[in-house]
């Protein structure tokens, strides 16, 4: 571990349309090659499609989807006496959100719809209802942690 001072967390400005920090963070996750305007168009387009498809508030759907995709525990490799063990550890709250957002984006990319906006809208709606790729990924991670519960005494 470095002995220098801790680097302060950057303040993320809320997005212009909803004034929500999590939406702004999600845009940064969706963004590729620094094209923020494209990411903004994708996310806002997905939110509009959520409104037309389900008639629900897109922010509500987004936060529900995010909560359903957040992992509580994950496994980390720990080397003990020449053997690697998958040790279950609790996930920090900031990492929970980051992982959930990443999984939502990745699951949306793998979907079959035409545009990324449509894929994202579909994935968010699915995740809000407790299904979809991101929720499946979370269940998989939880299953791994449950299977390796015996090694939890090797905590970090």
From Swiss-Prot:
One GO BP:
translation
Q: Which GO terms describe its molecular function?
A: rRNA binding; structural constituent of ribosome; tRNA binding
Cite the InterPro entries for this sequence.
Ribosomal_uS7, Ribosomal_uS7_bac/org-type, Ribosomal_uS7_CS, Ribosomal_uS7_dom, Ribosomal_uS7_dom_sf
Alphabetized Pfam families for the sequence = Ribosomal_S7
Which SUPFAM superfamilies does UniProt cross-reference here?
A: Ribosomal protein S7
Q: Could you give one GO CC term from the UniProt record?
A: small ribosomal subunit
Q: Which family does it belong to?
A: Belongs to the universal ribosomal protein uS7 family.
Purpose: One of the primary rRNA binding proteins, it binds directly to 16S rRNA where it nucleates assembly of the head domain of the 30S subunit. Is located at the subunit interface close to the decoding center, probably blocks exit of the E-site tRNA.
| HAMAP family (UniProt xref) | Ribosomal_uS7_B (MF_00480_B)
- How does this protein assemble? Part of the 30S ribosomal subunit. Contacts proteins S9 and S11.
Q: What is this protein called?
A: Small ribosomal subunit protein uS7
Q: Which organism is it from?
A: Thiobacillus denitrificans (strain ATCC 25259 / T1)
